[in-house]
Amino acid sequence: MEALRQRIEAAFETRQDISPSSVEPSVRADVETVINMLDKGQARVAEKIDGEWHVHQWLKKAVLLSFRIFDNGVIEGGDTKYFDKVPQKFADYDEARFKAEGIRVVPPATVRKGSFIGKNTVLMPSYVNLGAYVDEGTMVDTWATVGSCAQIGKNVHLSGGVGIGGVLEPLQAGPTIIEDNCFIGARSEIVEGVVVEEGSVISMGVYIGQSTRIFDRETGEVHYGRVPAGSVVVSGNLPSACGTYSLYAAIIVKKVDAKTRGKVGINELLRIVD
């Protein structure tokens, strides 16, 4: 793995000189190896080690190299055709393979090769970009999008129209991460490498980026780029220092533990926030 990483890093430094017609066969083979590893879940762009998320930038570099290496090609898609550099993940799947992996895919869901889909996931008509990791037991609901290299945990529900931001460039940025057992309400957007920690519930229509203030009304704390574990979050506003206007903020209205979540439905958690 270390030798592969070094070769990818070296190739990335010369990426401006790489094209589908000029790429060295060895570089193409290395990039294909990485894409296949990401596709099978043998590698992931970010992983939690000792309680902290670590980003493997070289894997992101391999994904970026793939756009310079692979040319557009025709992709069959039911009653139509597409023309793109990245093939479809399920293009070669048959019934036996879908059953073996425990994946349910509702047309016209689109998943690009190089993304991992865990067992017992359900993909409604949605979009999953390459480099993404969707763990087992997760529901990606209708018109939800999972951006490039985003990390989605186990037993997550991404409701209709949810947007999880991708982040290939700028390269130093971390991917957007939704940890295990989270619920993201309809039409919410979580972007720019924000981490939603385990067991959190995000209400409908909440928008969180790195500059969004995440206000905990119980403690008065303001967080940026991170929703603490077990938070129940709704959209709101905070007053300006001068008191003449207010600006959008995400408001943590309560905290819940796994036991409470197991006993109380999501709608009930969100119903009383006063």
Curated annotation (Swiss-Prot):
One of its GO terms (cellular component) is cytoplasm. It catalyses: (S)-2,3,4,5-tetrahydrodipicolinate + succinyl-CoA + H2O = (S)-2-succinylamino-6-oxoheptanedioate + CoA. Keywords: Acyltransferase, Amino-acid biosynthesis, Cytoplasm, Diaminopimelate biosynthesis, Lysine biosynthesis, Repeat, Transferase. Pathway: Amino-acid biosynthesis; L-lysine biosynthesis via DAP pathway; LL-2,6-diaminopimelate from (S)-tetrahydrodipicolinate (succinylase route): step 1/3. InterPro entries: DapD_Trfase_Hexpep_rpt_fam (IPR005664), Hexapep (IPR001451), Hexapep_transf_CS (IPR018357), THP_succinylTrfase_dom1 (IPR023180), THP_succinylTrfase_N_sf (IPR037133), Trimer_LpxA-like_sf (IPR011004). The keyword Iron does not apply. Substrate binds at R104, D141. Its EC number is 2.3.1.117. It is found in: Cytoplasm. GO terms for biological process: diaminopimelate biosynthetic process; lysine biosynthetic process via diaminopimelate. Disulfide bonds: none annotated. It comes from the Bacteria. Its main location: cytoplasm. The keyword Transmembrane helix does not apply. GO terms for molecular function: 2,3,4,5-tetrahydropyridine-2,6-dicarboxylate N-succinyltransferase activity; nucleotidyltransferase activity. Gene3D superfamilies: Hexapeptide repeat proteins (2.160.10.10), Tetrahydrodipicolinate-N-succinyltransferase, N-terminal domain (1.10.166.10). Belongs to the transferase hexapeptide repeat family. Homotrimer. This is 2,3,4,5-tetrahydropyridine-2,6-dicarboxylate N-succinyltransferase. It comes from Shewanella frigidimarina (strain NCIMB 400). The gene is dapD.
